[in-house]
Amino acid sequence: MAKQLCSYMFISMFILSAFLALPSAEGGATIKKCVVDVKLSKPCTFQECQPLCLQKYNGNGLCPGDDNNICACVYNC
């Protein structure tokens, strides 16, 4: 019984040390996000905004608000 307990403790310590050795997502290199507003000739729609931002900036397109002529492109700087 004591051998089994010792084995479980050793395995638990090994797994815990492996998790502690992994780099954390917070402490690593931070990815900076940029936003560009693109003025459109007509009200923004997701079907127009998303491909435009993907092609120009390799990012995501958002239409802030209703009946707005602005497409907001969010991408990694």
Curated annotation (Swiss-Prot):
<feature type="disulfide bond">
    <location>
        <begin position="44"/>
        <end position="63"/>
    </location>
</feature>
<dbReference type="GO" id="GO:0031640">
    <property type="term" value="P:killing of cells of another organism"/>
</dbReference>
<feature type="signal peptide">
    <location>
        <begin position="1"/>
        <end position="27"/>
    </location>
</feature>
<protein>
    <recommendedName>
        <fullName>Putative defensin-like protein 162</fullName>
    </recommendedName>
</protein>
<keyword id="KW-1015">Disulfide bond</keyword>
<comment type="similarity">
    <text>Belongs to the DEFL family.</text>
</comment>
<dbReference type="InterPro" id="IPR010851">
    <property type="entry name" value="DEFL"/>
</dbReference>
<dbReference type="Pfam" id="PF07333">
    <property type="entry name" value="SLR1-BP"/>
</dbReference>
<keyword id="KW-0929">Antimicrobial</keyword>
<feature type="disulfide bond">
    <location>
        <begin position="34"/>
        <end position="77"/>
    </location>
</feature>
<keyword id="KW-0732">Signal</keyword>
<feature type="disulfide bond">
    <location>
        <begin position="53"/>
        <end position="73"/>
    </location>
</feature>
<feature type="disulfide bond">
    <location>
        <begin position="49"/>
        <end position="71"/>
    </location>
</feature>
<keyword id="KW-0611">Plant defense</keyword>
<keyword id="KW-0295">Fungicide</keyword>
<keyword id="KW-0964">Secreted</keyword>
<dbReference type="GO" id="GO:0050832">
    <property type="term" value="P:defense response to fungus"/>
</dbReference>
<dbReference type="GO" id="GO:0005576">
    <property type="term" value="C:extracellular region"/>
</dbReference>
